[in-house]
């Protein structure tokens, strides 16, 4: 079986890229031939993947804002360049589109059996306040395109034989929003062998702290974390700067494993997630997660077993203070690790294969 995986942009630190790469690794381990196709992938990252025996075929080495606008508005240039790459390689039996940006590629009636896996965020991009803030003054124009964008996507997904989502929550939402039945979900695969408890590097347990992922100060959770940092020690992975919290910046995967492992608890970085890589990776490292009781967090976290689910910001702060004052049973760390197995590379790749057969 030969499988082609399509992603708009393969880049270090991207959840979409991790999905494509880890799924490819799992499929190869199961004896499948896999090619990754991307509109953009840097030469350095392509070389890194080659050392992992993964081949990426890409049109360009750097994504631009113009490219993003083209993708948002379904530019034929994006699709035509991707198809040139695909047609110049050996045909695949199956193609999996992982990027919402590439959903319209089947307008060209390509051969093979095609699957689309929705990660939710791009289709509902115009409801994402962080995105709209970053792309001001285009906000009003982008919001005006929301309904027409959904209608285009509703038409285009009808070209796919298989419709999947990255969580049960996403499956439910996208089935409703796009008015089509998404048949199943496949969790984004996490390298649970790599993300496991470790106590090395500079992130030693000199103090208990809560860990949170915040790319920058435009993230919706910044205000909440500001309040939390007044009460308990907080470390931030990302570039956000908050008084009272320690910003680690962008760190390597090795240091990320140690940051997770040494944290007393990880805070879910969003009030609503289609899937939380930070949550899955933290659980894999044996560190419980606290998050809002909505979105995919509900299917990832079992309250008082591998973490905690809260309804409000006040409840989040209160529970964190309680955790830091009284701790929790060590069995929660063991339960966290066990619960992460359903996100493993093996679990996700085998489920994908079974859904195709």
Q: How does the language model describe each region?
A:
Residues 257, 279-284, 298-299:
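Short alpha-helical segment that forms part of, or immediately flanks, the ligand-binding pocket
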Residues 122-124, 131-163, 171-172:
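Membrane-proximal helix-turn-helix segments that form the acceptor-binding/catalytic region
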Residues 215, 250, 303-314, 322-328:
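Conserved acidic donor-binding segment of nucleotide-sugar-dependent glycosyltransferases
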Residues 330-356:
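A charged, aromatic-enriched C-terminal amphipathic alpha-helix characteristic of glycosyltransferases
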Residues 258-263:
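Short alpha-helical donor nucleotide-sugar binding micro-motif in glycosyltransferases
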Residues 271:
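Aromatic "clamp/platform" in nucleotide-sugar-dependent glycosyltransferases that forms part
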Residues 176, 190-197, 201-244:
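Conserved catalytic-core segment of nucleotide-activated headgroup transferases in glycan assembly
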Residues 288-291, 301:
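Short hydrophobic beta-strand element within catalytic cores of glycosyltransferases
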């Amino acid at each position: 079986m030969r499988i082609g995986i399509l992603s708009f942009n393969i880049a270090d630190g991207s959840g979409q890229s991790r999905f494509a790469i880890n799924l490819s690794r799992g499929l190869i381990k199961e004896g499948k031939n896999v090619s990754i196709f991307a509109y953009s992938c840097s030469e350095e990252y392509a070389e890194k993947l080659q050392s992992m025996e993964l081949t990426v075929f890409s049109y360009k080495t750097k994504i631009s804002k113009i490219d993003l606008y083209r993708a948002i508005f379904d530019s034929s240039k994006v699709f035509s360049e991707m198809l040139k790459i695909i047609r110049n390689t050996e045909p695949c039996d199956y193609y999996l589109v992982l990027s919402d940006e590439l959903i319209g590629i089947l307008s060209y009636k390509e051969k093979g059996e095609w699957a689309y896996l929705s990660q939710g965020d791009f289709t509902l991009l115009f409801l994402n306040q962080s995105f709209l803030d970053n792309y001001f003054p285009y906000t009003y124009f982008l919001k005006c395109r929301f309904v027409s964008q959904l209608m285009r996507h509703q038409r285009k997904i009808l070209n796919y034989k298989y419709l999947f989502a990255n969580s049960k929550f996403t499956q439910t939402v996208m089935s409703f929003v796009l008015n089509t039945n998404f048949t199943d979900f496949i969790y984004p695969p996490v390298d649970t062998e790599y993300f496991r408890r470790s106590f090395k590097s500079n992130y030693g347990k000199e103090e208990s702290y809560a860990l949170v992922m915040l790319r920058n100060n435009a993230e919706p959770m910044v205000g909440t974390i500001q309040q939390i940092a007044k009460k308990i020690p907080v470390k931030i992975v990302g570039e956000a700067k908050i008084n009272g919290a320690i910003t680690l910046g962008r760190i390597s995967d090795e240091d990320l494993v140690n940051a997770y492992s040494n944290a007393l608890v990880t805070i879910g970085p969003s009030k609503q997630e289609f899937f939380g890589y930070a949550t899955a990776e933290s659980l894999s490292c044996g560190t419980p997660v606290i998050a809002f009781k909505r979105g995919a967090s509900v299917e990832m976290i079992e309250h008082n077993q591998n973490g905690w689910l809260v309804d409000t910001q006040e409840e989040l702060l209160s529970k964190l203070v309680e955790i830091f004052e009284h701790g929790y049973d060590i069995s929660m760390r063991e339960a966290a690790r066990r619960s992460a197995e359903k996100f493993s590379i093996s679990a996700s790749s085998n489920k994908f294969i079974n859904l195709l057969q």
